[in-house]
Amino acid sequence: MSAKSDSRNNKAVKSDEPKKRRRKKARTAEVSDSDSSDSESDRAEEDDNEDNEDTTNHVIDEGDVEMMEFDKDDAAAAASAQTMDIPAELQSLPADSANPEFQKFYLNLVTSEFGKDMDELRTSKTFNDNTLGLLVDALKQGVNVFDEKVQGEIVQQQS
């Protein structure tokens, strides 16, 4: 048998194997005019070389494992650094800086004005414990729109 027929026989055996990722790359790669002049035997050699490269890439070295562990340490350090980036004036604020009397007044006003909308939210299929917390937090954020002086004036007017 000639070398060409051997390579064709090998191709028949390889076609029984599951397709590899390189097949997808071959379909999506752009082909220039110079590539179209390649012969079938050159393409077969390139396919064989790619097969060998695919199997060698699956071996993990100890250095790779060390790099993965290093990446995990970097991710943990980055997460802790993000919590440290909070400005000092925001860290010193209490959890709820609004006047409690004003907060009560504001939340009662909002719930009475938007009662129908809130009922629609509560009866929707997507409403659950998590979204309840989000709704409450969103309503409480409206209190922070007013500064302390305005909050005090509104509370005095209501009393």
From Swiss-Prot:
Pfam families: Rsa3. GO terms for biological process: ribosomal large subunit assembly. It comes from the Eukaryota. The keyword Nucleus applies. GO terms for cellular component: nucleolus; preribosome, large subunit precursor. InterPro entries: Ribosome_Assembly_3, Rsa3_C. The keyword Oxidoreductase does not apply. Keywords: Nucleus, Ribonucleoprotein, Ribosome biogenesis. It is found in: Nucleus, Nucleolus. Residues 32-54 have a biased composition (Acidic residues). Residues 1-63 are annotated as: Disordered. Residues 1-19 have a biased composition (Basic and acidic residues). Belongs to the RSA3 family. Associates with nucleolar pre-ribosomal particles. This is Ribosome assembly protein 3.
